[in-house]
Amino acid sequence: DAGIISGVMSFAGPEFNLNDAQTGWVVSSPSFAAMIAMLVSGKLSDRIGRKKILIVVAFLYAFSALASAYSYSYETLYIARMIGGLAFGAALILAPTYIAEISNSQNRGTLVSIQQLNIVLGFFAAFLSNYYFNNLNSTSQIFSDEIVWRWMLGVEFIPAIIYFILMFF
């Protein structure tokens, strides 16, 4: 989401008539939510279990992607991005811990490193996705200026639902 939003705001901002302050809040809202999630997710996962919380996190990611894509106002976009921020913050804390707990000592470092690498690859994929949708925007009715930003946000649903499904294995 953090990578996607850079391409989204040039379309969503004008659609919702956002001023600079509102644009700033939409862009930064996941960071605030992530801080809150980071503060509580460790203790919560100690009580409930990391895997259970990570399943909820995956669901929140998927929900946030769809809610962002279908936002009809500044407020709904802001709330949807806050939900995504909660998921992101919890995942940053819990995923490496969970991986370390379930992996054997010979593979632990490699597996946690791969998880961190996947975060960076996700940012790269987001930028490529924005580029792709912007290029489609100029050649396709389906990706017009009015809805291309919705596709940019909605495409996040794909990795989120894969994450959700794989958490059950």
Regions found by a protein language model. Give the residues of each.
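Transmembrane-helix signature of 12-pass secondary carriers
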Residues: 1-169
